[in-house]
Swiss-Prot record:
Protein's recorded name: Homoserine O-succinyltransferase
Family recorded in the similarity comment: Belongs to the AB hydrolase superfamily. MetX family.
Residues marked Important for acyl-CoA specificity (site): R346
Keywords, alphabetical: Acyltransferase, Amino-acid biosynthesis, Cytoplasm, Methionine biosynthesis, Transferase
Subcellular location: Cytoplasm
Species of the source: Bordetella bronchiseptica (strain ATCC BAA-588 / NCTC 13252 / RB50) (Alcaligenes bronchisepticus)
Catalytic activity: L-homoserine + succinyl-CoA = O-succinyl-L-homoserine + CoA
GO MF annotations in UniProt: homoserine O-acetyltransferase activity; homoserine O-succinyltransferase activity
SUPFAM superfamilies reported for this sequence: alpha/beta-Hydrolases
Length: 415
């Protein structure tokens, strides 16, 4: 077991968990991250080694004395460890899955101890390309190692070790987070009792890899990118990152959802309805995408975008078994819940059905729900009653099996 330490150089607000004091019914309360430092080298799939690193985490609920009620939530591309509750630093910063995690919510923190981990390579507190490379004293930039989903799982396992958690009650995630949950079930089968995979896939299609490549090229060809070392130049490849986000955002929405939100509505049309016959914003959808792109470029790191999209491309557990997904999933001993959404064309329901068929072939216990929802891939983030009922029911079954009926008895500060 590795022995992480809390970073003593960080502000006091980040040196220890802030108790989640609910500010409203169903809220996980005001939360702040903990920064764990790991000095044990982490071997990576690329053959490189990361000698030391920090991971930003948040926790919700209380770890029981038996350490059996822990749930790991894995995040998608542009999310972070801030899964639920309200940030202590910004009252407007609500966790990205706050409708899913909290007291009385589908993942009920009166019963479960939930951990959110910001992945290596991200830009929200964990070690990544913008961090200082101890060998040079400068930001890593493009020299930061390329990572895989499996690398993230190995790093997350050390967080579990830190808390003394031998086996998670569940590991769950949506989209890229679902890939991490699946990887946990394959690579650490003895440590996962339940695997919850939402709006995900066992591998990216050529189309998805193509979208990622176009987004990366937008960033890399931005004159302000400087080969990934833009930190030293005091620039940000904001134009490229904005375009990358615009491309990605289109893939997260369904055609029907975009038609309902925007249709062909014009932005400030002329009184006579004539076109402007120019290349500035003409339609509402253009304005929306530009806004999303520009907002994203102000808070996300371009090198992180490159790194995470490449990790998405590389994920393919069946690659090691000649394309046989059932064989790739054979080590898994967990029970599974898979959820897909009817209008998700980024990771369509057929990809979830493929995983279900492979699991059934192996005799794995699996529950599958395909939710009829109009919102495309982003439906996994929304408060859909049918979707949440499925997840709630699954976690209630886990709670019954573990004897978690109501709030757990505190053991003390687990960190």
């Amino acid at each position: 077991m590795t022995n992480p330490v809390l970073n003593p150089a960080l502000p006091a607000t980040a040196a220890a968990p802030v108790a989640a004091t609910p500010s409203a019914v169903g809220s996980a309360g005001i939360v702040a991250p903990v920064f764990l430092r790991f000095d044990e080298p982490l071997p990576l799939a690329s053959g490189q080694t990361l000698d030391g690193y920090e991971l930003a985490i948040e926790t919700y609920g209380t770890l029981n004395a038996q350490r059996t009620n822990a749930v790991l939530v894995c995040h998608a591309l542009n999310a972070s460890h801030h899964v639920a509750g309200v940030s202590a630093d910004n009252p407007k910063d609500v966790g990205w899955w706050d409708n899913m995690v909290g007291p009385g919510k589908p993942v009920d923190t009166n019963r479960y101890f939930v951990i959110g981990v910001n992945n290596l390579g991200s830009c929200f507190g964990s070690t990544g390309p913008a961090s200082i490379n101890p060998a040079t004293g400068r930001p890593w930039g493009a020299a930061f190692p390329v990572l895989t989903v499996e690398d993230w799982v190995r790093a997350q396992a050390r967080v579990a070790d830190h808390f003394g958690i031998e086996r998670f009650a569940a590991v769950m995630g949506g989209s890229l987070g679902g890939m991490q949950a699946l990887s946990w079930a394959i690579t650490c089968p003895q440590r996962v009792a339940n695997c919850v995979v939402v709006a995900s896939t066992p591998r990216l299609s050529a189309q998805n890899i193509g979208f990622n490549e176009v987004a990366r090229r937008a960033i890399i060809t931005d004159p302000d990118f400087h080969g990934g070392d833009y930190y030293a130049h005091g620039t940000v490849p904001g134009r490229g990152l904005s375009v990358a986000r615009m491309i990605g955002h289109i893939t997260y929405l369904s055609d029907d959802d975009m038609a309902e939100k925007f249709g062909r509505t014009r932005r400030e049309p002329a009184a006579d309805g004539a076109y402007r016959y120019g290349y500035d914003v003409e339609f509402e959808v253009e304005s929306y995408l530009r806004y999303q792109g520009e907002k994203f470029s102000r808070y996300f790191d371009a090198n992180t975008y490159l790194l995470i999209t490449r990790a998405l491309d590389y994920f393919d557990p069946a690659r090691a078994t000649g394309g046989d997904l059932a064989r790739a999933l054979a080590p898994a001993t967990a029970d599974f819940l898979l959820v897909s959404f009817s209008t998700d064309w980024r990771f369509p329901p057929e990809r979830s059905r493929e995983m279900v068929r492979a699991l059934l072939k192996n005799g794995s216990p699996v529950t599958y729900a395909e939710i009829d929802a109009p919102h495309g891939h982003d439906a996994f983030l929304l408060d859909d009653a049918r979707y949440h009922a499925v997840v709630r029911g699954y976690y209630e079954r886990i709670a019954r099996e573990l004897g978690l009926n109501g709030a757990v008895a505190p053991e003390g500060n687990p960190a």
